[in-house]
Amino acid sequence: MLRSDVLVIGCGIAGGTAALELAESGLDVAVITRANRAGESNTYWAQGGIIFRGENDSPESLAQDIVNAGAGLCHEQAVRTLASEGPPLVQSILIDKLGVPFDRTPDGKLALGREGGHSIARIVHATDATGRAIEDKLIEALRAHPRVRL
């Protein structure tokens, strides 16, 4: 019988990061997935980039771009939370902790792209397989953590 403090269902970016954070807080975590192999999630197949922060960017500018892209049909508090908390989490989890190999410029800076609805370049990519790059690093970290059973 499998015993753990927490059961996480799914090992995409949401489930995987939740499992990793819970394990790092000292809990024993079991992760289950419907996929044939760990890492085969919707995250894995995502090709586009992920919102980060551009040069001279601000949470207010990002929030305005999200509202504009959503034709104003957005939950205001969710937009504010995403705009203020999203980029720092990309930095601390995906870049610093997991070391996701996002594309870089020749001088080593993150290569930021500009996608539809954004007024400035603030999107990080890992070639055209951003989701796979994120998922590969996330699964690697989960497998290496002594408190996670995958």
Mark where each language-model region is:
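Short helix-loop-beta connector
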Residues: 1-3
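N-terminal Rossmann-like FAD-binding beta1-loop-alpha1 element of flavoenzymes
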Residues: 5-31
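Conserved N-terminal/central alpha/beta ligand/cofactor-binding core
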Residues: 34-150
